[in-house]
Amino acid sequence: MKHLLVSLLALLTATAAFAQQAAPSCCAKPAPDALVAFASLAADPAFMSGHDAPLPLDYQEAGKLVTYPTPDSSTAHAYQVGPGTKDGKYLLVIHEWWGLNDYIKREADRLAASLPGVTVLAVDLYDGKLATTAEEASRLVQAVDNNRAKNILRGALTRAGAKAQVATLGWCFGGGWSLQAAMLAGKQAVGCVMYYGMPEKDVAKLKTLNTDVLGLFATQDQGISPAVVKQFQADMKKAGKQLTVHSFNAVHAFANPSNPKYDAKAATQANTIALNYLLKKFRLKA
């Protein structure tokens, strides 16, 4: 009887130990949501103070405003420059936190002029809303319905065509969404440019990427900090995906089209790197 009790006690102890070891795998915390993380960052007064309001811009559009259906039985708006050929080459541009303003349209024009034959589609994740102050921009970021934003991007990908070659590009708010758009694009994706956007933190999601990523970051960025970039590099390595990082001795938003105090030297260098990357991805000559 005594031996039986000892055996039962040993069995119970082993079972408890196994349960403790197994618990972390079933109860592990999910990776922090990158979109939620950026929305929280956008509410930080220090982050807000680093974004000066855009100045008035006298600008003549080279493209046109278009609408297209989205999977949620709604309609989305975008600014389009280029041929608009179904199943052609497309660059999806995602605006910074101010919205799809004239500065973004002008940047879309510049990119289209530098990428012959490529349709540049600057999507509007705010559904027509624009911010003119950091406070307004912060509220718009926090009010974004991420499911709606993804449907806007899905609609744009459908507009491009199932066989289209699609690259994505965005700054700040749009930088993070550029990565999200590349993941949504699946086999359509041929490139992704992130200007200091919030990286995806879920390695399982990063594994769905069908393209490499070009990341342009700032060493003095207190939000998308060097530590955040380092973790992104580690996560991409775990996912088995290629990430090329260029870091500039500048602050956040140094290349934002709407930034009245943008760093001309760093922005020019970053834009040149981005353009050369896109030329290669679309197999175009400089």
PLM-predicted stretches and their roles:
Residues 209, 215-217:
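Short beta-strand/loop motif that positions the catalytic acidic residue
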Residues 6-16:
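Bacterial N-terminal signal peptides
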Residues 22-60, 64-160, 254, 258:
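Serine-hydrolase catalytic machinery in alpha/beta-hydrolase-like enzymes
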Residues 26-27, 239-286:
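C-terminal catalytic histidine-bearing segment of alpha/beta-hydrolase fold enzymes
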Residues 220-224:
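Acidic catalytic loop of the alpha/beta-hydrolase fold
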Residues 17-21:
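Boundary at the C-terminal end of the N-terminal hydrophobic targeting segment
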Residues 107, 225-235:
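Short alpha-helix in the alpha/beta-hydrolase fold that links the catalytic acid
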Residues 155-208:
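Primarily recognizes the serine-hydrolase "nucleophile elbow" in alpha/beta-hydrolase
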